[in-house]
Design a protein with these regions (language model features):
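Periplasmic N-terminal soluble interaction domains immediately after the signal peptide in Gram-negative
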Residues: 1-11
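Intrinsically disordered, low-complexity polar regions and short flexible loop motifs
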Residues: 17-18
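Short beta-alpha junctions and helix-cap segments that line functional grooves
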Residues: 3, 101-102, 165-167
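Catalytic-core regions of hydrolytic enzymes
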Residues: 9-11, 21-146, 150, 154
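Active-site-adjacent mobile loop/cap segments within catalytic or ligand-binding domains
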Residues: 123, 159-222
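Short secondary-structure junctions
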Residues: 1, 155-160
Length: 222
């Protein structure tokens, strides 16, 4: 079917308008506040891969890219740490360090989501894939975790180990929907190389932001 010249011009106009409108459409995360928690840091390296890649560095890099993208979307990002430091104080105990991260969230009543970023490790280097953890203290924890997991699996291309229930301290003691993502296994040489790559880190951050946008787009609950 051939579109007449005049009509064809109008179709092109509509297409251009649609594209412009789509670009100008504000992010669903706009105006919302998210706490981002890069795991470990300072005196705690977290997992360390065979090539020496440290979990604390990957977590911080992905968290900072996520922070940047959220700001671009008009959202507010609160970081539990922005540098390679202990959140509580140098050499603080694990419970005190975890509570310090929770305290950052509790100090910001405007915060609506808590996202903790980690990498995995196992004694067997064949262990692979990404996964997301939640603790069902609100109606939305599992839903938030599911969105994160779906977007990470699609963007990262790693084996999807699914969403899992866990009693991690930061998931239980925050008062808002929270999830903890394990981006991949540093104990797996192939995944370690990916997780150290800045372009891959940015791709993961984009996935995290898409999940956050979907969460707010859907009104916060499934």
């Amino acid at each position: 079917h051939t579109i007449p010249g005049e009509a064809h011009g109008k179709v092109k106009e509509y297409l251009i308008i649609d594209i412009i409108t789509a670009k100008e459409q504000p992010s669903a995360a706009r105006g919302h506040t998210v706490v981002i928690d890069p795991g470990h840091g300072g005196s705690d390296s977290g997992a360390v891969g065979y090539a020496g890649v440290r979990e604390k560095d990957v977590a911080l890099a992905v968290a900072r890219y996520t922070e940047e993208l959220l700001h671009e979307a008009g959202a507010y990002a609160i970081m539990t740490r922005t540098e390679d430091v202990d959140v509580a104080h140098v050499g603080s105990s694990a419970p005190r360090e975890l509570q310090a991260r929770v305290d950052v969230s509790l100090a910001h009543p405007e915060a609506e989501l808590f996202l903790s970023v980690h990498c995995n490790s196992f004694t067997n280097p064949d262990a692979h894939g990404m996964e997301t953890y939640y603790y069902p203290k609100t109606d939305a924890d599992e839903h938030f975790a599911a969105l994160l997991n779906e977007e990470l699996a699609a963007a990262g291309g790693l084996y999807n180990r699914g969403i899992k229930y866990a009693k991690f301290y930061v998931l239980r003691h925050t008062e808002i929907p929270a999830a903890l993502v394990e981006l991949g296994f540093l104990s797996n040489p192939e995944e370690e190389a990916l997780l150290a790559d800045a372009a891959y880190q940015k791709r993961l951050a984009q996935a995290l932001v898409r999940a956050i946008e979907r969460y707010f787009e859907q009104g916060g609950e499934e």
